[in-house]
Each structure stands twice: as structure tokens, then as C-alpha cells.
Amino acid sequence: MSVTLDLQIACADSTGLPSETQFQQWLDTAVLPFQQEAEVTIRLVDEAESNELNLTYRGKDKPTNVLSFPFECPPEVEDFPLLGDLIICRQVVEKEALEQQKTLESHWAHMVIHGSLHLLGYDHIEDEEAEEMEALEKEFMQTLGFPDPYKDDEI
């Protein structure tokens, strides 16, 4: 029962980033309730790479906090543990944490959990799906000792 993490740091400045142990803990919290064996790549990038990927895959010409690329296993291959890749933009995460008055650690954890749920097939396009996904995010954040990441989104 384990999640294998391939952490890639592609940021020009890697100081102040969460540790590999932190990323592993956040990933385990989000993935293990659903999948006993998994492999996930988390790539930490700067704005230029995030912008390029966001434009290429989503048609949006701006960097974004997290992009999720689920692995699509061919039907003839069974029980392949590769879950997918998360691309997280350091500058966007740092800017959002400041704007939303969240601790940087809390926001990093939330981005890993949010992205991991996308890899597992969760989405937030429809209201009902969004509620289910947000409930899981809140539960996992609480498990890790972090506050509700959506508490200030309610009006």
C-alpha cells in the first residue's frame, strides 16, 4: 500500500519549497483512500512553463496553480499503477496564498490534494460534482491539520 512520488523541481529558485516528505504526505492523504498502489509525478514549475502547458492543453494564455494530467491506461493493460502527473506553478501558488490570506504550506497542500482528486477522476464543472470534490478536499485538509480551504469562498 503505497504511492510512489516522482518529484521534479523545474523552478529557477527552489528555496522555500515544501519538502519531498510533505509532498508525499499530502499525496498519500488524497490518493490512498481510493487506490492502494499508485505512481504520481509532481513537477514544480515557473510561470513560463505553466503558461505554455495551460495554453496548449486548456486554451488559456496564463499560468495556473495546478494542472492535472491523468494517465489513460490502454484497455488491455490491467492494474497499472501510474495515476498521472501534477504540474504546480510555484509563483501562482505563492500569489494565491498571499491574496487569500492562507499559509503557504496550507495552499501547497490544497493544490496537491485538489490535483490528486482530478487524477482520480473527480471534477468541479457541475455543481453536484464540485460539492463532492470540495467535501473531500475539506476532509483531507482537516485530516492534515489545515483549515477549510473554501471557508472564505462562501458569501
Swiss-Prot record:
Q: Which cofactor does it need?
A: Zn(2+)
GO MF annotations in UniProt: metalloendopeptidase activity; RNA endonuclease activity; zinc ion binding
Sorted alphabetically, which InterPro entries does this protein's record hold?
Answer: MetalPrtase_cat_dom_sf_prd (IPR023091), YbeY (IPR002036), YbeY_CS (IPR020549)
Its keywords, alphabetically, are: Cytoplasm, Endonuclease, Hydrolase, Metal-binding, Nuclease, Ribosome biogenesis, rRNA processing, Zinc
Q: Is Transmembrane among the key words of this record?
A: no
Protein known as: Endoribonuclease YbeY
List localization entries. Answer: Cytoplasm
Q: Where does Zn(2+) bind?
A: 114, 118, 124
Annotated function: Single strand-specific metallo-endoribonuclease involved in late-stage 70S ribosome quality control and in maturation of the 3' terminus of the 16S rRNA.
**EC number(s) per entry:** 3.1.-.-
Going by the entry's taxonomy, the superkingdom of the source organism is recorded as: Bacteria
* Gene coding for it: ybeY
Family the UniProt entry places it in: Belongs to the endoribonuclease YbeY family.
PANTHER family (alphabetical): ENDORIBONUCLEASE YBEY, CHLOROPLASTIC
| Record-level GO BP terms | rRNA processing
Keyword match Cytoplasm:
yes
- Which species is this record about? Tolumonas auensis (strain DSM 9187 / NBRC 110442 / TA 4)
The terms describing its cellular component in GO are: cytoplasm
Cofactor comment text: Binds 1 zinc ion.
Q: What class of enzyme is it?
A: hydrolase
